[in-house]
Amino acid sequence: MEARDIALSAVLAALYAGLVVALAPISFYVFQVRVADALLPLSAVLGWPAVVGFTVGCFLGNLAGVLAGMPSGTVLIDATGGSFANFLGCYLAYRLASGSEDKKRLLASTFAITAVITAIVGTYLPLLLGLPLWMGWLGIFLGSFVSINIMGYLVLLAFLRARLRSFRGTP
């Protein structure tokens, strides 16, 4: 990775972790709307720097789970499992969209991220918290749908419009 890519990864990691910590009350447990996840679809167009940044950001942000009242014995598992889910989901989105600005491919990439996070986090989190598996899948899916498929897709479209304007030099 070039220095520019490393810097972008660091900025995205800090932004993701900062949002998780700042919005800790709604960023943890089975029923959550993790606003930081609205950034994940950017990996479809930003590529590896975003995949790495959101993976590291999730690990760091999830370590702060103790602040949200997560049992301390679950925090390291959540940090590892969540960052793996982010890595896999963001990588899959990047591969599906392949840097394309085609709206169908971009939308499909948001569903891929949601599916991966629901499958991984929705499976281990209820087991850690002693809840039924269906509750984990439902809760994580609903929160991810809101944060990734709705908010994240809108963030992605806004990013693409802003990037297009900056290259054209128009306001």
What are these regions (language model features)?
Residues 1-49, 56:
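Hydrophobic transmembrane alpha-helices
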Residues 44-54, 70-78:
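Interfacial helix-start motif at the membrane-water boundary
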Residues 21-31, 35, 59-171:
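Membrane-embedded alpha-helical hairpins and interfacial helices in multi-pass inner-membrane proteins
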